[in-house]
């Protein structure tokens, strides 16, 4: 059930009856304040302006033509022509009953399913994942989960950095450390240390540096020994990433990896295609595409090097090849890139070239979904105390440890294994939610204290709200699926909660459209807050509560729990029965 869509259809039909042109919107939105309707239709003002008529008069005609029999209690015109719509509690109760028994919580699947490619995470395999990878990984994953839930075919693409000149240095170092034999996994147990050793060796030893450069040429030429060492390095690095994904409860698998190396064979043909079209031209020995569309303030076109003077290719070349593959082979109709805001110009260049070259038609949506930076309490990018990058594995481990302290303090009687499992869900959930609940494009300050709080818009607060509902059912001794009584919405709290529950589909649609997970977080927090108000005002298991009223309230409770669990699940956050 999508109330907004239903009202939109009905109001548009009424507007058409009143002679309003079909391209003018009904502008349906939930009521913002008490006393201004459960929903508002705000299209009369714009329509009246376009038609040269009085907005209140037009609103009156729309109301007269509006068929909401059995759905709305009351329609009223406010201000210059707002139409306030008050929904019938009996109708809302029926919709709640349908949602409560529906496997999908009455969320319809998308009418026009698409193939959506989502490019996210993308760590460099030469280094361990750090906090800078967190945002792309969890924001991208939440959209992948959501779009699949809505019925789209989602193809995850983990565009890892597995190619480039640094691999000559790393392979040479690995070969020397392995000697005649040895365990590569053991040598690479700390990728960060290994990378630093290789870099120092490269900087300090000219002979080693020459060997590293030679190894790059051999690797790029397909030398079997170089490829074998490179593959070992790649496998072990990917295993590190895979462990992080499992810890984070992220859906990326090895099958989703499409490293830069995957596109190697297409780079030269791609450059030739751009040359043949006159888009790529020689400039100082390099092949460059000049884009007047992205000119600087002095009118100089934006230069994009796609092949260096020595014949080497660049990130832009690989990204263009990846884009061509995603459109031609994967048949993507929407391609979403969850990449740092600092790559904004680069992505604009890639998108512009791909359109001009005809690699991508106008029917394909290309979206760079940039995000802000995680900051420390000093207002600078989040670092260790010594100023180094924070490893993601260490951050997640600390989150679980801190959550274990909080959980054991609140519930000292819990068994050790229960504390460990709850702490894992609370700690990882807290880190993810603290990020996802912020507007994607904004920077935010990382704070252990606020993210692990059981108050406010946090994962622990929502997880706790879920467990409270579960405890009510244990106390009542009732299985939710046995409840079949009508839903009675006799109080303001019950009605407010019911309307919010029925807006789940609207919120998911908006999040899918705008790629903004904070919209879902805000919605879930609103649900939990309205539930707490309902719980305080509407007794459920107290003596003297009528059986039909009790069962109706239990059904509302059940839908609250399922909505929180489903919503958090789409964010990749787990719930627990007890806390």
Swiss-Prot record:
It catalyses: tRNA(Arg) + L-arginine + ATP = L-arginyl-tRNA(Arg) + AMP + diphosphate. This is Arginine--tRNA ligase. Keywords: Aminoacyl-tRNA synthetase, ATP-binding, Cytoplasm, Ligase, Nucleotide-binding, Protein biosynthesis. Its main location: cytoplasm. It comes from the Bacteria. A motif ('HIGH' region) lies at residues 123-133. The lineage of its organism: Bacteria, Pseudomonadati, Pseudomonadota, Gammaproteobacteria, Cellvibrionales. Pfam families: Arg_tRNA_synt_N (PF03485), DALR_1 (PF05746), tRNA-synt_1d (PF00750). GO terms for cellular component: cytoplasm. HAMAP family: Arg_tRNA_synth. Monomer. It is found in: Cytoplasm. GO terms for biological process: arginyl-tRNA aminoacylation. CDD domains: Anticodon_Ia_Arg (cd07956), ArgRS_core (cd00671). Belongs to the class-I aminoacyl-tRNA synthetase family. Its EC number is 6.1.1.19. One of its GO terms (molecular function) is ATP binding.
């Amino acid at each position: 059930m999508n109330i907004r869509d239903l009202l939109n259809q009905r109001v548009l039909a009424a507007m058409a009856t009143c002679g309003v042109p079909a391209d003018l919107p009904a502008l349906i939105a939930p009521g913002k304040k008490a006393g201004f309707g459960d929903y508002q239709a705000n299209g009369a003002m714009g329509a009246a302006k376009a038609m040269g008529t009085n907005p209140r008069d037009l609103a009156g005609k729309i109301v007269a033509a509006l068929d909401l029999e059995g759905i709305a209690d009351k329609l009223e015109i406010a201000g210059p022509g707002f139409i306030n719509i008050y929904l019938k509690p009996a109708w809302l109760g029926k919709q709640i009953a349908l949602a409560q028994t529906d496997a999908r919580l009455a969320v319809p699947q998308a009418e026009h399913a698409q193939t959506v490619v989502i490019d996210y995470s993308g760590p460099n395999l030469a280094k361990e994942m750090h906090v800078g990878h967190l945002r792309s990984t969890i924001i991208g994953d939440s959209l992948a989960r959501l779009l699949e839930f809505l019925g789209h075919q989602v193809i995850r693409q983990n565009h890892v950095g597995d190619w480039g000149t640094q691999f000559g240095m790393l392979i040479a170092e690995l070969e020397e450390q392995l000697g005649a034999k040895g365990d590569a996994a053991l040598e690479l147990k700390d990728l960060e240390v290994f990378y630093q050793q290789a870099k120092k060796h490269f900087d300090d030893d000219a002979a080693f540096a020459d060997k590293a450069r030679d190894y790059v040429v051999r690797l790029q030429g397909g030398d079997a020994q170089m490829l074998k060492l490179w593959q070992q390095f790649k496998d072990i690095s990917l295993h590190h990433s895979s462990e992080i994904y499992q810890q984070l409860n992220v859906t990326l698998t090895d099958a989703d990896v499409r490293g830069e190396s995957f596109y190697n064979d297409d780079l030269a043909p791609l450059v030739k295609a751009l040359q043949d079209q006159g888009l790529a031209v020689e400039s100082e020995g390099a092949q460059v595409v000049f884009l007047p569309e992205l000119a600087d303030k002095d009118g100089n076109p934006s230069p994009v090097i796609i092949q260096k003077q020595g014949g080497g290719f660049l990130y832009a070349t690989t990204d263009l090849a990846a884009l061509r593959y995603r459109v031609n082979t994967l048949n993507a109709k929407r391609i979403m890139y969850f990449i740092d805001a600092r790559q904004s110009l680069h992505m604009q260049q890639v998108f512009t070239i791909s359109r001009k070259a005809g690699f991508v038609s106008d029917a394909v949506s290309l979206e760079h979904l940039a995000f802000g930076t995680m900051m420390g309490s000093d207002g600078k990018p989040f670092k260790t105390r010594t100023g180094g990058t924070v490893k993601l594995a260490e951050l997640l481990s600390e989150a679980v440890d801190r959550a274990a302290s909080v959980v054991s303090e609140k519930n000292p009687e819990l068994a050790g294994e229960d504390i460990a499992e709850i702490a894992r869900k609370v700690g990882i959930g807290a880190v993810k939610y603290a990020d996802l609940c912020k507007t994607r494009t904004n920077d935010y300050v990382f704070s252990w204290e606020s993210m692990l709080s059981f108050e406010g818009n946090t994962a622990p607060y929502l997880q706790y709200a879920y467990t409270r509902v579960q405890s009510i059912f244990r106390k009542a001794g009732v299985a939710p699926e046995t409840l079949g009584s009508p839903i009675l919405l006799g109080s303001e709290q019950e009605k407010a909660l019911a309307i919010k529950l029925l807006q789940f589909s609207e919120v998911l649609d908006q999040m899918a459209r705008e790629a903004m997970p904070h919209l879902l977080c805000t919605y879930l927090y609103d649900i939990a807050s309205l539930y707490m108000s309902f719980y305080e005002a509407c007794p459920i298991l107290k003596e003297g509560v009528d059986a039909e009223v009790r069962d109706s309230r239990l059904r509302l409770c059940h839908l609250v729990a399922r909505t929180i669990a489903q919503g958090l699940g789409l964010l990749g956050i787990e719930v627990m029965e007890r806390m």
